[in-house]
Amino acid sequence: MANVTDPRDIILSPVISEKSYGLIEDNVYTFIVAPDSNKTQIKIAIEKIFKVKVDSVNTANRPGKRKRTRTGFGQRKATKRAIVTLAAGSKPIDLFGAPA
């Protein structure tokens, strides 16, 4: 980890889906991350951005889907997702920016 990068270059966006929204109750959050990032970089970035304690990080590489267009076929972008579990005593992450 010789490269010192901005944590916001690693964490691209939260995943908002029915499954990820249901996992929030268990202190598990899902993010789309940079494809070249590793679990240690993701953990440090989450702790810096949201000021929480991370218990574990699981990652999944999702291939892009082939989609039809008017002129033929196209390819959706491949993504890397990080499933982040927060420590037991950690405060929840406010993903939607609601006033406290």
From Swiss-Prot:
Q: Does the keyword rRNA-binding apply?
A: yes
One MF term from GO for this chain?
Answer: rRNA binding
Does the record carry RNA-binding as a key word?
yes
Q: Which residues form the signal peptide?
A: none
- Source organism, top-level taxon: Bacteria
One Pfam family of this chain: Ribosomal_L23
Q: Which GO terms describe its cellular component?
A: ribonucleoprotein complex; ribosome
Q: Which keywords annotate this record?
A: Ribonucleoprotein, Ribosomal protein, RNA-binding, rRNA-binding
Q: Name one GO biological process term.
A: translation
Q: Which PANTHER family match?
A: 60S RIBOSOMAL PROTEIN L23A
State whether it acts alone or in a complex, and with which partners, per the record: Part of the 50S ribosomal subunit. Contacts protein L29, and trigger factor when it is bound to the ribosome.
Give the family from UniProt.
Answer: Belongs to the universal ribosomal protein uL23 family.
Function statement? One of the early assembly proteins it binds 23S rRNA. One of the proteins that surrounds the polypeptide exit tunnel on the outside of the ribosome. Forms the main docking site for trigger factor binding to the ribosome.
Please report the name of this protein according to its UniProt entry. Answer: Large ribosomal subunit protein uL23
Gene encoding the protein: rplW
